[in-house]
């Protein structure tokens, strides 16, 4: 029986069994000098990278040059920011890219968490280090009292820490916004499940390689027969 030519110019194998032959053909690249793999990887990995967490994405960026380029892609870090923090800032364009914006947001949230740890532990020296030593810093406690300037602010915290015990807040709905060397954080902080939340705004400035608090405003919302808000 005569053999039938194959599409690639070859002929089928002789014998009773069939055998599949895989051939590699050259496909014209639409980008001269760039392999098909390099063209396909960004398209394939963009979706896959959105499933990685922060440590995994950082580790990936330290592998080969191709993966490093993919892991440093702005869209990957924007997706991670939205997954870990909030969708509220979808329309912004960070000056130094989403990777740095993500890292700075983590740093701000860490400092903000430290603030509540200091309150819980009544650590006055740590609170003094957290605040910027400046005459323009402001602190408004839930009582409505305003303290202005570094010395007054720290003295106000000393009075708070002289109470019998520290406060262990449960913090929720944390939202940050960063503008170069300034950031503010809004949140709700609860002392117990029955009471209403404290509505808190903290403002930080970046000085000498560290984020320092420059403004704290706490108002309390009491939920009973009626809702009372202290601003």
Swiss-Prot record:
Domain spans labelled F-box: 34-80
Q: Which SUPFAM superfamilies match?
A: F-box domain (SSF81383), NTF2-like (SSF54427)
Metabolic or biological pathway: Protein modification; protein ubiquitination
Q: Which InterPro entries match?
A: F-box-like_dom_sf, F-box_dom, NTF2-like_dom_sf, SKIP8-like, SnoaL-like
- Give one Pfam hit by family name: F-box-like
Q: Which UniProt keywords apply?
A: Ubl conjugation pathway
Q: Which CDD domains match?
A: F-box_FBXL4
Query: Could you mention a single GO BP entry for this protein?
Result: protein ubiquitination
Question: Cell membrane: present as a keyword of the record?
Answer: no
Residue ranges, annotated region (Disordered): 1-24
Query: Has UniProt tagged this entry with the keyword Metal-binding?
Result: no
Subunit details for this protein? Answer: Part of a SCF (ASK-cullin-F-box) protein ligase complex. Interacts with SKP1A/ASK1.
Q: What is known of its domains?
A: The F-box is necessary for the interaction with ASK proteins.
General function of this protein: Component of SCF(ASK-cullin-F-box) E3 ubiquitin ligase complexes, which may mediate the ubiquitination and subsequent proteasomal degradation of target proteins.
Protein name, as recorded: F-box protein SKIP8
């Amino acid at each position: 029986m005569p053999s039938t030519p194959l599409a690639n110019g070859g002929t089928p194998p002789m014998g009773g069994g069939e055998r599949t032959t895989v051939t590699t053909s050259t496909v014209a690249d639409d980008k001269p000098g760039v392999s098909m793999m390099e063209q396909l990887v960004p398209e394939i990995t963009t979706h896959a990278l959105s499933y990685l967490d922060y440590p995994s994405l950082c580790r990936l960026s330290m592998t080969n040059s191709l993966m490093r380029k993919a892991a440093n892609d702005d869209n990957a870090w924007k997706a991670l920011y939205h997954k870990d923090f909030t969708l509220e800032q979808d329309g912004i364009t960070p000056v130094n890219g989403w990777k740095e914006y993500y890292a700075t947001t983590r740093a701000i949230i860490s400092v903000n968490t430290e603030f509540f740890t200091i309150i819980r532990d009544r650590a006055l020296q740590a609170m003094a280090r957290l605040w910027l030593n400046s005459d323009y810093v402001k602190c408004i406690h839930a009582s409505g009292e305003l303290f202005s300037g570094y010395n007054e602010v720290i003295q106000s915290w000393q009075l708070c820490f002289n109470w019998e015990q520290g406060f262990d807040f449960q913090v929720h709905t944390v939202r940050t916004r960063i503008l170069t060397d300034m950031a503010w954080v809004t949140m709700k902080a609860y002392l117990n499940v029955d009471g209403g939340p404290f509505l808190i705004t903290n403002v930080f400035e970046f000085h000498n390689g560290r984020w320092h608090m420059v403004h704290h405003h706490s108002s309390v919302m009491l939920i009973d027969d009626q809702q009372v808000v202290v601003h």
